[in-house]
A protein has these predicted regions:
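Short, solvent-exposed amphipathic helices
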Residues: 29-33
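Amphipathic alpha-helical segments used for helix-helix packing
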Residues: 6-28, 76-84
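A local structural micro-motif
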Residues: 13, 56-57
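C-terminal peripheral helix-coil segments that are non-catalytic and often amphipathic
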Residues: 3-7, 35, 39-53, 59, ...
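Short, conserved alpha-helical segments within structured domains
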Residues: 22, 58-62
């Protein structure tokens, strides 16, 4: 997801704008297909938690957290560039961001 945010930020922003405007086009898919997909994936994570492979967490909200961490790099790339400077779009800067997001995810999951 973060790679997509770097590679296609305009597509990510288009989706975000659709959501911010009430999701009139995609709302039926969000309520059905996305809801079902998240529930299925959350059940898998819940199973891993029950086996002691992951730290206890709200697995549905875990997806929101990952989405927000990755979506930010597309939706707020101008803000990020202003804070980080001109090299924010470099491969090194993108790798730094990816490494940070992954460390956060591992930490949430208790896998660090």
């Amino acid at each position: 997801k973060i790679g997509f945010s770097f590679a296609r930020p305009e597509a990510s922003r288009l989706f975000a704008n659709e959501i911010l405007q009430g999701a009139q086009v995609v709302h039926p898919l969000l309520k059905t297909q996305l809801r079902q997909l998240v529930a299925e994936k959350a059940r898998i994570l819940d199973g891993w938690i029950a086996l002691g492979k992951l730290s206890a967490m709200d697995t549905t909200h875990f997806f929101f957290t990952v989405w927000s961490m990755t979506q930010t790099y597309a939706d707020f790339d101008i803000q990020i560039a202003a804070v980080l400077g001109d090299d924010s779009h470099s491969e090194t800067a993108q790798q730094r961001a990816t490494d940070h997001v992954l460390r956060c995810v591992w930490r949430i999951c208790g896998l660090e």
